[in-house]
From Swiss-Prot:
Organism in which the protein naturally occurs: Spermophilus citellus (European ground squirrel)
Topological region Vesicular: 44-100, 156-193
Stretch list, region Disordered: 232-307
Biased composition (Low complexity): 258-274
Protein name: Synaptophysin
Cytoplasmic topological intervals: 1-19, 125-131, 218-307
GO biological process assignments: regulation of neuronal synaptic plasticity
Glycan attachment sites: 53
Domain notes: The calcium-binding activity is thought to be localized in the cytoplasmic tail of the protein.
Family annotation (Pfam families): MARVEL
Phosphothreonine PTM positions: 220
Keyword Calcium: yes
Domain MARVEL: 15-221
Lineage of origin: Eukaryota, Metazoa, Chordata, Craniata, Vertebrata
Length: 307
């Protein structure tokens, strides 16, 4: 019990909610329905033979047949209207297609159960070295092909079984029914709805296994080289160098450098550092407005270059 509890506790049951595990559950269930509806079939037909001599007639002849539909081994006793009976055998052997269909269904059932247990309890081993998904994909592809072949073969085989067990066709092959004065009638056809259902489940399994190929294929990683990453955001182009000068703001000629506003080449440059007795002009005590400030020698010093 401890081992079971550990397995249950360590199981990743959420995989059943994912497409990979959920489809595997459907495959397991539909495989059961496929081989159960075909392998457990048991049919019966009825007919009557009425002889000219009423005492020799048999008005209720029952003929039973079942899986695997070796009809050539099925017979019934019919009156020959001459005081005796004759063994009448059905025609055909359709066991190959029926047994092939059931065999594929049984193996699909077993594989689905094993794969589902691996998904839940051995997820790490399944993904180790990517071997598990690769083997799973190959097995799924094989089973998809086998479902196609077996379902198609069984659909044809079922059509032949219906023809061989049709009371009208059986009556046509009976010698006693061709004799004058004798009357043969069909009383009941065999019910083959279960066999029809088995064919439907066969093709449903085909759809499930083919569809599951995509989910298993994604687990293999083979699709990674074909998946392109979404394009990234385009890089922002730098502004042209001559938009605001080659050197930028405050970095030399051509920009918006503050050094030229009051630079050495011109501008308002009052000399506040001259001594009081200096003769350089300005507002010193030795000069007035007629000598140095606005003399005929030229314009004021502060505007000599800019004006």
């Amino acid at each position: 019990m401890d081992v079971v509890n550990q397995l249950v506790a360590g199981g990743q049951f959420r995989v059943i909610k994912e497409p990979l595990g959920f489809v595997k559950v459907l495959q397991w269930v539909f495989a059961i329905f496929a081989f159960a509806t075909c392998g457990s079939y048991n049919g019966e037909l009825r007919l009557s033979v009425e002889c000219a001599n009423k005492t020799e007639s048999d008005l209720s002849i029952e003929v039973e047949f079942e899986y695997p539909f070796r009809l050539h081994q099925v017979y019934f006793d019919a009156p020959n209207c001459r005081g005796g009976t004759t063994k009448v055998f059905l025609l055909g052997d359709y066991s190959s297609s029926a047994e092939f269909f059931v065999t594929v269904a049984v193996f699909a059932f077993l594989y689905s159960m094993g794969a589902l247990a691996t998904y839940i309890f051995l997820q790490n081993k399944y993904r180790e070295n990517n071997k598990g998904p690769m083997m799973d994909f190959l097995a799924t592809a094989v089973f998809a092909f086998m479902w196609l072949v077996s379902s198609s073969a069984w659909a044809k085989g079922l059509s032949d079984v219906k023809m061989a067990t049709d009371p009208e066709n059986i009556i046509k092959e009976m010698d006693v029914c061709r004799q004058t004065g004798n009357t043969c009638k069909e009383l009941r056809d065999p019910v083959t709805s279960g066999l029809n259902t088995s064919v439907v489940f066969g093709f449903l399994n085909l759809v499930l296994w083919v569809g599951n190929l995509w989910f298993v294929f994604k687990e293999t990683g083979w699709a990674a080289p074909f998946l392109r990453a979404p394009p990234g955001a385009p890089e922002k182009q730098p502004a042209p160098g001559d938009a605001y000068g080659d050197a930028g703001y405050g970095q030399g000629p051509g920009g918006y450098g503050p050094q030229d506003s009051y630079g050495p080449q011109g501008g308002y440059q009052p000399d506040y550092g001259q001594p009081a007795g200096g003769g350089g002009g300005g507002y010193g005590p030795q000069g007035d407005y007629g000598q140095q400030g606005y003399g005929p020698q030229g314009a004021p010093t502060s505007f000599s270059n800019q004006m």
